Amino acid sequence: MNLKEELKAGLAELGLALSAPQELLLVHYVELLDKWNRVYNLTAVRETGRMLSYHVLDSLAALPLVAGQRILDVGSGGGMPGIPFAISQPDWSLTLLDANHKKTTFLKQAVIELGLTNTEVVCERVEAFQPERKFDVITSRAFSDLAEFVRLTRHLLAEGGEWAALKGVYPDEEIAQLPEDVCVREVIELKVPGLDAERHLVKLGLR
């Protein structure tokens, strides 16, 4: 199967219905990631088919479980999960935050080439980031442990908002280290097409 066919099969397995233009944008995103990765080392994954599973489908597996209009992707890196979210949900407002200049250079170019008018890229350390408005959902995929994630981002969470962290195996120890005023709302096991590994979405909120 080519990349487009693999994507279609993966979306069907996830039960996600995207338009043909959205599917093309996701394929183009993988191609951009592959091209820039050769110079900027954005991901250890080197093959486009694996990038599709490890990065795009892994991000999209969490998409139906995220509820909010203003989303912050912390430590966005190569744009996961923020860019797949932005392509799939054009009515959402996405902010991709990373302190690494090379990564945000890629992100800015990807946003331009993909025509993502709902997406802003910010190069700044998360603890120094002071946006005009706070966020409904703060997400991360490979940023830090849960306690550190919450500590560094709590000033960015809107009232009633939630954290949504993509993790591998069930993070028992990380959950045990959370501060007392943070509750676990839900931990959902994710099944990612083409990925034979444990994946979980951890949703947290303030008590």
UniProtKB/Swiss-Prot annotation:
SUPFAM superfamilies, sorted: S-adenosyl-L-methionine-dependent methyltransferases
Its EC number(s): 2.1.1.170
Subcellular location field: Cytoplasm
Residue positions binding S-adenosyl-L-methionine: 75, 80, 126-127, 141
Keyword GTP-binding listed: no
Keywords assigned by UniProt, alphabetized: Cytoplasm, Methyltransferase, rRNA processing, S-adenosyl-L-methionine, Transferase
InterPro entries in alphabetical order: rRNA_ssu_MeTfrase_G, SAM-dependent_MTases_sf
Pfam families: GidB (PF02527)
A GO cellular-component term linked to this record: cytosol
TM regions (residue ranges): none
Subcellular location, principal: cytoplasm
GO MF annotation, one: rRNA (guanine-N7-)-methyltransferase activity
Catalytic activity: guanosine(527) in 16S rRNA + S-adenosyl-L-methionine = N(7)-methylguanosine(527) in 16S rRNA + S-adenosyl-L-homocysteine
Entry-linked HAMAP family: 16SrRNA_methyltr_G
Family according to the record: Belongs to the methyltransferase superfamily. RNA methyltransferase RsmG family.
Function comment: Specifically methylates the N7 position of guanine in position 527 of 16S rRNA.
PANTHER family: S-ADENOSYL-L-METHIONINE-DEPENDENT METHYLTRANSFERASES SUPERFAMILY PROTEIN
Protein name: Ribosomal RNA small subunit methyltransferase G
Source organism of this protein record: Laribacter hongkongensis (strain HLHK9)
Gene encoding the protein: rsmG
